[in-house]
Amino acid sequence: MRERLRRFVTRQFGNPSGLFGKFIGNRMARGNVYDAQWTVSLLDIKPHDRILEIGFGPGVSTQIASERASQGFVAGIDHSVTMVQAASQRNADAIQSGKMELKHGDVSSLQYPDASFDTAFSLHSIYFWPDPVNCLREIKRVLKPAGLLAITVQPKDKWKPKVDANIMTLYYGDEIASLFSSAGYRNIRVEVSPPEDNVFLECILGLS
């Protein structure tokens, strides 16, 4: 019974759906504000930048990025229809004004032309990518030359409770940095959230 519950919750975290998915999304919206603010602060967003978020969830980080790119454009893809609906409601004004586009999609096959974005980022999404190197290459394809990619994770030893390892792959930052290298990124570095904030995050950054 416990294993089935763990599997169900892990699946919902990766692809929220239905009433429980809405609950997960609300929890993400409340619990990941720091993660979103910290990650976006590392992106050095310019007012006219074009930005892509992979796995935007309830749309909190997308909203913060859009506020930074005040005269730019933010696109986002998520494979949860429930999260697309929730994030679209949260960001309705930006979408209506043409500053943002949120849609259902798959990181392994991005429906954007080559060199479309200055920056791409993702929070707590890479755990669910079945082939992370190929997904990173696909993101690299849609980044402009020397475009920035940032991936934020919680290090694997900080995860409590346990998750279903058949559904979700946990990482340390240096492991993802190695994936970045295999995918052809350069100037790769790992940033660690300030210990005094008592939030355990690592953000891996690299240039296309």
Indicate residue ranges for each PLM-predicted region:
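Core SAM-dependent methyltransferase catalytic element
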Residues: 183, 192-208
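Short alpha-helix
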Residues: 168-183
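Conserved SAM-binding loop and adjacent beta-strand
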Residues: 20-40, 169
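A short acidic, Gly/Pro-enriched loop at the edge of an enzyme's catalytic core
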Residues: 108-119
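A short SAM/SAH-binding and catalytic strip from SAM-dependent methyltransferases
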Residues: 119-131
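Class I SAM-dependent methyltransferase SAM/SAH-binding core
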Residues: 50-109
